């Protein structure tokens, strides 16, 4: 056992990747975190090996968010077996620090609800943008969810393009490139990735700002692809763990 400090285990199961982190109950920085590809056929034995790194911590709380519903029972059983606690799951009766209408409450993914929760902890007027398998954004006005926008992710689109273009199949694309203008096919693709990231954030922010001209609108950017965002027209915060933190906040709001 690491110490007597209580920890919360937070699980975010995405379509492509699963991220698991632990936090001290009273802190917002992750103590330990693991990331691995989501496997719809995973089992208790496999998960137990992955999460064994957390056994040394005094884990007394847990929340599991998932956009892959079939995996929830496996995670429930694994966490209960390893830590002797029952994880909390988001449901239609879950309370939030923001207002959400009935329809989006039923349809919006757990991860985006967690992003909303983190956003309103920063400011009552806020947009959150997640760059991952999908590009997703949420807009909150006066602590109320106005709406969201979802598009195919950069990695998915790039992989499909490389599959179709024979000249690109042996080329290495640097998704971390910050160049705005490409001088050949590869650097042009790298420029496109950079401009798509920054352009999506810029446009979504501006549309929200038009709807809320007199507010101090904040912008939170997160997700595995949230790097090299080049925007000078407004301030933004990049927090890779915003969604995990949102789940943590949801847990303690409901328990």
Swiss-Prot record:
Active site: 111 (proton acceptor)
A Pfam family per the record: Pan_kinase
Protease is among the record's keywords: no
GO cellular component, one term: cytoplasm
Primary role: Catalyzes the phosphorylation of pantothenate (Pan), the first step in CoA biosynthesis.
HAMAP family according to UniProt: Pantothen_kinase_3 (MF_01274)
Catalysed conversion reaction: (R)-pantothenate + ATP = (R)-4'-phosphopantothenate + ADP + H(+)
Protein name: Type III pantothenate kinase
UniProt GO MF annotations: ATP binding; pantothenate kinase activity
Compartments, record wording: Cytoplasm
Assembly notes: Homodimer.
Coiled-coil intervals: none
Annotated family: Belongs to the type III pantothenate kinase family.
Organism of provenance: Malacoplasma penetrans (strain HF-2) (Mycoplasma penetrans)
Binding residue positions for substrate: 109-112, 185
Record's keyword terms, sorted: ATP-binding, Coenzyme A biosynthesis, Cytoplasm, Kinase, Nucleotide-binding, Potassium, Transferase
Free-text remark on how the cofactor is bound: A monovalent cation. Ammonium or potassium.
Main location: cytoplasm
Organism domain of life: Bacteria
UniProt cross-references to PANTHER family, sorted A to Z: TYPE III PANTOTHENATE KINASE (PTHR34265:SF1)
Pathway: Cofactor biosynthesis; coenzyme A biosynthesis; CoA from (R)-pantothenate: step 1/5
Annotated residues for binding of ATP: 12-19, 133
Record-listed E.C. numbers: 2.7.1.33
UniProt record, GO biological process: coenzyme A biosynthetic process
